[in-house]
Amino acid sequence: FKPYLLVQTCANFNWYDDEGLDKAYNQDNVANSGFSIPYAVLGFTGKAFGKVAFNLSINAAASGGALLQQAWFDVQLKKQFAVRVGKFKTPFSHAYLTTLGETLLPQLPVSLTSAVILPYSLNAVTPNIGTGFDLGVEIHGLVADKFGYEVGLFNGTGSSVNTATKTLSDDWHIPSLLYAGRFTYMPKGVMPSTQGNPNRLNEDKIMFGVSASINVESENESTNDTRVGVEFAMLKNKLYLGAEAYYMNVGFTDRQKINESYNYLGGYVQGGYFVAPRLQAALRYDFFNRNGTGDDGFLNMPAVGMNYFFKGCNLKLQAMYQYIARTGHDTQLDRDNDNLGLATHSATVMLQYTF
């Protein structure tokens, strides 16, 4: 039994282009800036009877269903087969870490978290590629100490919903759930859930992964969303490298009477290197075909950052700057629409404490 704590406090600056701003309402280019607390997590984890692991954590900085960050138990019958039930990370993308506070940069890739653009005025249909945390059940295991698998069923409603709201698909006559799976190959043993830790500078690990999911009747029973991803991660002494590419197809349910489906691509490459024993430099290039493969143009999103780990007190200082560029669009209107709601220039300085 082990209690734990994570508190993050940020100073944020975001500058938005004029597109989408209504000067009549005195909307400024600088918005969503100031101080924030994205996470104030209190939880406990442990293992009972030699085979039942458990974890419960509350994020006091959130509201609604998102207050419950994680709540699960895991029954390991053997290393090759275990069952996990509750609220936990879905099997897609290693950008979402289960180890608190060990991400390379304080902001996740925009290509995972930003809603895609659809050419229809359906306010309830705002899917993004990342699936994050959700409620469900999963079987998982490690075979021959290098082949990992995760296969599960989830609500598909995300981390902010803790209730059973799903039904049966009118089109496919199956439960309207998120069906997801992920398979990894780790030839040098299990990849640690970290993107940089000054206490683990002698690691030599590498991981290759592939994942797929389909969210049946998602977005208020409007769409069937299919996702496929490939990933790579490496820890080699002072160096961390990570890369992912993902694809999403959004197809509408029959009741919407929209025959077209839409395809989206995204991905990122990021790396961190400890230039000093407690100072890690970080770079990321993020790519997002936000308006779909049927239209030209995409978002280029380079980012730079640094992490400083204070000695002997579990404090970590992170800083990050990101620029969102647009390229290859057919018209100025397409270019203007592609980054609506996204800050062209964003900077974050975050101090976090873990216990």
List PLM regions with ranges.
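Detector for outer-membrane/organellar transmembrane beta-barrel domains
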Residues: 182-291, 300
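Extracytoplasmic loops and strand-loop junctions of Gram-negative outer membrane beta-barrel proteins
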Residues: 23-27, 117-123, 164-166, 212-216, ...
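Outer membrane beta-barrel transmembrane domains
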Residues: 272, 278-326
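Outer-membrane beta-barrel proteins
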Residues: 14-18, 65-67, 94-97, 160-163, ...
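Outer-membrane beta-barrel "beta-signal"
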Residues: 178-190, 310, 315, 339-355
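Membrane-embedded beta-strand positions in outer-membrane beta-barrel channels/transporters
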Residues: 39-41, 70, 136, 180-182, ...
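Outer membrane beta-barrel
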Residues: 1-159, 175-190, 200-201, 270-287, ...
